[in-house]
A protein has these predicted regions:
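Gly/Gly-Pro- and Ser/Thr-rich, intrinsically disordered tail segments characteristic of DNA damage-repair
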Residues: 1-235, 242-245, 283, 381-435
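A residue-level signal for beta-strand positions that form part of recognition/binding surfaces
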Residues: 11, 35, 76, 251, ...
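Short, charged/polar surface micro-motifs in flexible loops or helix N-caps
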Residues: 19, 42-45, 302-305, 366-369
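Short, hydrophobic beta-strand segments
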Residues: 113-119, 308-311, 368, 373-379
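Acidic, metal-coordinating catalytic segment for phosphate/diphosphate chemistry
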Residues: 315-435
Length: 435
């Protein structure tokens, strides 16, 4: 870095504490002080903990834990179903508060944001004072608490917000980050996941300070380019700007996946679920003015074996049938019964040896609706136009009368597997840090 480039910046990272659970407790005050988690219905096998409140966390309940596991470690826990529309509304209200201090705001998921308040000091005060104001307003106006990190770059601002929770403000200024951050486990640094942590551990690197003092060349040899990036982060060399909200990286793919209420045991089961998911993917592509040129599926069986496969489409598409059929062909071509299990095949030829537990489908390699390409000479343009108009009509009907107002006949073959509105249930995931 050039000396002084990032020293003069003031970056905040604001993290809403136990966000989903905190919002729910505003609507369920009778549950305050009791263990609460937000997740899917416990009777549905795919339910996991999305957020737990601090009372539940003290019992050992963690984000990502299966609901049945959470119930084991905390028998008195109360599960609440997620309400994404409600959380998104609170997220937007939080952004409105942040907007009073800067236009340089970069959301990191639904409950976190970086703020560059460098230019706000004259009117609003220094970074610590702004963090205090934001913390106070979030409590008074939204009823939730935040942890805020104040630093000279994004990496240490994020580390500061993680440093102490809940309802805390932590500074990580240039003259103090070595004292505060270098003693922390290296896994606390952004982008040090489990696999990277194991590699660093094998190199004798336990803390952020160990990483900072390591040989950068050796790190690159072991971790590739990421080794150099992490070494720079540990030493405070991060000049990445806080992106304006409307300049974040464009959508690169649109997908949906699900763990079904019961195992998928036949080809028809898989086809039903793929069509449900493809309807959501295609509808969201149309809403955003995109078509996909590649379809990818992800499949996991009951023993958690999984594979991913993709195929290039003849023509870019946002048509449900084309996306679903491409995904179904990928599944048929790549999921096979073991050849040696003749007895099982003869007794139950229509069943898999290992039923499927979850499946996902994704449209990638996106182009805009006005992207021009030569249509395949063997394709029937009138039939394709008919499919497009049918999809658009279904969009209109569902928008007015609800998802279940019009359904494909295929869905009525299994009401358990088809009881899913994948588009409405879709969760928006965080933007990648590197764009």
């Amino acid at each position: 870095r050039k000396e002084g480039d990032s020293v003069n910046r003031t970056i905040l990272h604001s993290d809403c504490n136990c966000f989903y659970a905190s919002v729910e407790l505003l609507h369920h005050p009778e549950l305050r002080g009791k263990p609460v988690a937000v997740g899917g219905a416990p009777e549905a096998r795919h339910g996991i903990v999305l957020t737990a409140d601090y009372t539940a966390k003290r019992y050992g309940v963690k984000t990502g834990m299966a609901l049945w596991q959470a119930k084991q470690v905390c028998p008195d826990i109360t599960f609440l179903p997620p309400r994404m529309d409600l959380y998104l509304r609170f997220s937007r209200m939080a952004q409105e508060i942040y907007a009073d201090y800067t236009d340089k705001r970069e959301p990191y998921g639904i409950d976190e944001s970086w703020l560059d308040v460098t230019d706000s000091a004259t009117l609003k005060g220094d970074g610590f004072h702004i963090a205090q104001e934001i913390s106070s307003r979030m409590k008074k106006e939204l009823g939730i608490t935040v942890s805020v990190g104040v630093s000279f770059n994004k990496i240490f601002a994020k580390l500061g917000s993680d440093y102490k929770k809940p309802d805390a403000i932590t500074t990580m200024y240039e003259d103090e980050f070595q004292r505060k951050a270098w003693c922390l486990p290296v896994s606390d640094l952004l982008y040090v996941g489990n696999a990277t942590n194991k590699k660093l551990y094998s190199m004798g690197i336990r803390t952020i300070g160990d990483l900072a003092k390591s040989d950068e060349t050796l790190l690159v040899r072991k971790l590739g380019k990421m080794g150099s990036i992490l070494w720079a982060f540990a030493n405070g060399y991060d000049e990445s700007p806080v992106k304006l909200e409307n300049t974040l990286a464009p959508v690169k793919s649109v997908g949906n996946s699900t763990t079904t209420p019961r195992d998928m045991e036949t080809d028809e089961d898989v086809k039903i679920v793929l069509y449900i998911l493809a309807e959501s993917v295609a509808a969201r592509l149309r809403e955003n003015g995109f078509r996909c040129r590649t379809v990818e599926i992800n499949v996991r069986d009951k023993e958690l074996f999984h594979f991913s496969k993709q195929v290039k489409l003849q023509n870019a598409s946002n048509i449900t049938k084309e996306i679903a059929e491409a995904g179904y062909r990928l599944y048929k071509d790549n999921y096979r019964l073991p050849a040696d299990d003749k007895e099982l095949k003869s007794s139950r030829p229509e069943f898999f040896q290992k039923p499927l537990r979850s499946i996902g489908i994704r449209g990638t390699d996106l182009v805009t609706d006005y992207f021009w390409e030569q249509l395949d000479m063997f394709m029937d343009p009138q039939a394709r136009e008919k499919q497009m108009k049918m999809d658009e009509t279904v969009d209109i009907i569902r928008k007015r009368f609800g998802f279940y107002s019009v359904q494909r006949g295929l869905m009525y073959r299994d009401i358990i597997l088809s009881a899913c509105d994948a588009k409405s249930d879709h969760t928006v995931h965080p933007h990648g840090y590197f764009g």
